[in-house]
């Protein structure tokens, strides 16, 4: 692996810690570390993320860091939202590549105006921006799309993922999932991710998809509990059970379901939140592929591994925003 590739890191949470550890085992050089809070600036990124000192102090000025010329690729390990959009715009303008885990299909996740602006900047500067991860990014999209190529068309795909959300971190649980709140209805963030996964599969199957339905949503606790360190009272959000179904010509072609609860809660125990992934693919001749994946309970090491692996695939991509399927396998 070339030591000429300099890597910048944004974030100080679990994913950032796994990235610091993973990068040590590669030839890539971690040359900058950016944090959201100025209070955390000046600290060693290794120590800040729960590891050993590596001799790299953090900074909090993202714009200045991106424009500094100190790194070629930014590994963004922050939350989705305005900060992520800002980071993409800065990288696209400065000619810095970015790998993130906030979305995997820009056509679904990024509105047309922003997507057009980012694409124009990136194509002008030479920047490549791509998202990857485990879900979305592997279990419910890349893997079934690959398996579908072994069956005669038209193929019908069903996938289900059960997650223990205990290790997801309070920022994600509270700000992205609404755990501990009185929100109700669709699990908006999860629904968007499932729609991205469905779009990746639809691309592989060459489906137009005349109708997409969302079902299920946020789940309320029946009694007081604790989810990943977040206190949840009865009637507040403790997790989700979300589903997306894609139809073509009135027939179901793709059904993706994702449930997430703390394993020690009653609902988590009942639904088997053990990290498992179930895939069922049916070909036109009724031939079937059925797969059970005993996926790791902790998604963070795998997410970091996918992000680091993506660095090597960037040179082969043209400048612009890309879905995770644009990356080479492996």
Where in the sequence are the language-model features?
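N-terminal Rossmann-like dinucleotide-binding module
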Residues: 1-49
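Active-site-lining helix/loop region of Rossmann-like oxidoreductase modules
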Residues: 6, 10, 148-268, 275-277, ...
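Short, ordered loop/turn segments at secondary-structure junctions
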Residues: 36-38, 79, 103-106, 134-135, ...
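Conserved N-terminal Rossmann-fold NAD(P) cofactor-binding segment
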Residues: 37-69
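Rossmann-fold NAD(P) dinucleotide-binding segment
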Residues: 64-73, 81-103
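Rossmann-fold NAD(P)-binding glycine/threonine-rich loop
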Residues: 103-127
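Alpha-helical support elements that line or immediately flank enzyme active sites
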Residues: 132, 138-151
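C-terminal helical cap and adjacent loop that interface with cofactors, partners, or active-site loops
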Residues: 266-330
């Amino acid at each position: 692996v070339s030591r000429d590739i300099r890597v910048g890191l944004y974030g100080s949470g679990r994913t950032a810690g796994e990235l610091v550890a993973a990068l040590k085992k590669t030839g890539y050089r971690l040359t900058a570390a950016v944090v959201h809070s100025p209070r955390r600036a000046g600290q060693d990124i290794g120590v800040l993320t729960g590891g050993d000192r590596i001799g790299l102090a953090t900074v909090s000025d993202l714009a200045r860091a991106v424009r500094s010329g100190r790194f070629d690729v930014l590994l963004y390990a922050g939350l989705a939202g305005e900060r992520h959009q800002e980071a993409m715009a800065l990288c696209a303008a400065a000619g810095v590549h970015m790998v993130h885990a906030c979305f995997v299909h820009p056509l679904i996740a990024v509105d047309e105006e922003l997507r057009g602006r980012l694409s124009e900047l990136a194509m002008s500067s030479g920047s490549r921006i791509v998202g990857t991860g485990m879900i979305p990014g592997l279990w419910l999209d890349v893997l079934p799309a690959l398996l579908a190529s072994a069956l005669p068309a038209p193929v019908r795909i069903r996938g289900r993922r059960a997650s223990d959300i205990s290790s997801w971190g309070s920022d994600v649980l509270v700000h992205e999932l609404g755990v501990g709140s009185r929100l109700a209805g669709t699990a908006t963030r999860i629904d968007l991710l499932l729609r991205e996964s469905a779009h990746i599969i639809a691309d592989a199957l060459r489906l137009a998809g005349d109708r997409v339905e969302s079902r299920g949503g946020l789940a309320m606790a029946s009694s007081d509990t604790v989810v990943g360190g977040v206190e949840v009272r009865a009637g507040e959000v403790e997790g989700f059970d979300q589903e997306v179904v894609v139809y073509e010509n009135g027939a179901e072609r793709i059904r993706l379901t994702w449930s997430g609860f703390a394993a020690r809660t009653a609902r988590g125990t009942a639904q088997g939140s053990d990290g498992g992934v179930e895939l069922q693919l049916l070909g036109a001749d009724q031939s079937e592929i059925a797969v059970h994946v005993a996926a790791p309970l902790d998604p963070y090491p795998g997410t970091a591994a996918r992000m680091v692996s993506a660095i090597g695939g960037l040179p082969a991509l043209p400048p612009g925003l890309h879905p995770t399927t644009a990356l080479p396998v492996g």
